[in-house]
């Protein structure tokens, strides 16, 4: 589904990703962990095509297509979804309008007719309930005046409606209490599917108690330096990232 080979990228002339490679098959959940500044959020932003990130080398293939040549909207229509660490507000545009337009754009890309408004409203209300959001949130501006937890739940609701092929969750657990974390995780787990894959970016292991990954990767100094199963996340929780950073430092000094 997703093939990343030797990906290199920079932000404001600073090299962040320095030869990252990763293969993700349909139905797999991959957790990306690492210290602050390792490039975790940069990876998600580069994959989604966010402005301000310059790819300087490498290849990224999504379902056999080179997504680096696509703009952000085209990548979304192809089935790539990014849940931001800090979801943005869009004042003046209701959640319902935004979601309907997004879903219809994806449907049009697939050659399908727009969903009629009555059917969509019923579906949106169902998804609101699934992530424990009041239906009044559909009338409000996108993320406008939402708490941190409400923004995260709103993004999971978007994911449920859009039905993407690849979901990138960028520190979705950031700032969430345990109850909100469980609601978000349940929403994510309900979308696990043999044809849908996830990249779960997190700094802490606790999210992975609820969204259990197939693979865990440690990102440090712009590339994946260690991979394993769920036990690797537990090791990181116990030891921290110091041992990883020390190994990298010794390797550079060798």
Positions of predicted regions on the chain:
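ABC-family P-loop ATPase nucleotide-binding domains
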Residues: 88-165
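ABC ATPase NBD Q-loop/coupling interface
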Residues: 59-75, 143
